């Protein structure tokens, strides 16, 4: 009995001693890492789909190993955060910081994408609206970030052109706001009453505060202000919501959307909407899109004293619930372009555009 008491006392003393010898700096690093884990587990929208019974042991082992590595000085707390966030493989969930090295180092752990700049002499897609030939008009739309006004102008130019065929080239379009592509979608739409996938918020007080939404703004949006009694998962767009418009545009007769592996988020949503509601539109490309469209509405979690910021999605598509996710495989083109990458993609009419223009004439 006395032997057991002595052993217990020695163990307690050893534990206390080990704890007391942990430097304050390491404790601070661990606290920062733990705060990121807490945010992911309590605010990251698709967490319950990302960590399941199948991979729960792997996830817990990763956390344990990263804490151990920080404690023993085998890796920095930043590197542990990079490895942790990268494990989820979600391009809407990523790390950046006060200098470009933060994102560069995080990218080592992020889900890989095709690096077209290594395959081409110049990869810098720029907005274009011009005639390819007598039958075909090209709109190159490389971003959905605050570009709706430009899109409206490009749509007007196409309508005035008289060209029966339209190519919308969205290579390199990493997203932005869905409203930006709406002028194009309204031209492509030809299938009334087709139903969209829904959107669900993981509705936490922390995320709402990070978005900067006031109580008045929440009320104007019809969202709960009593977080204690609000549902954790709140349906924002009901699954099966339909597209219905008053008219269908006569032109284009045929349409193409050109994609690549850099197309993501709102860029991919344009592809999904067109595939759903436009029978006259085909998707062309060599590679699948990135696969970054099943999450969204992203606030920032800032670790101010460390110069590190984490973007994470507070919303997910109901495709997660239905097992029909686009992420992470991306959207496959309807037609695979049988050509290598062009040497240049800037403000030029490249080989892919010419090939697609000919294919639309068939």
Task: Label every model-predicted segment.
Residues 4-17:
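Sec-dependent N-terminal signal peptides
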Residues 20-223, 251-254, 280-282, 289-305, ...:
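Flexible, low-complexity junctional segments that flank or bridge functional domains
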Residues 145, 174, 263, 316-318, ...:
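Residues that cap or initiate secondary-structure elements
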Residues 171, 251, 257, 331, ...:
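Cell-envelope and extracellular/periplasmic
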Residues 215, 222-239, 245, 263, ...:
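Cysteine-dependent hydrolase recognition
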Residues 230-299:
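Flexible, glycine-rich surface segments
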Residues 311-313:
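Conserved active-site loop/cleft motifs that coordinate metal ions or position small ligands
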Residues 315-349:
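Active-site rim recognition segments
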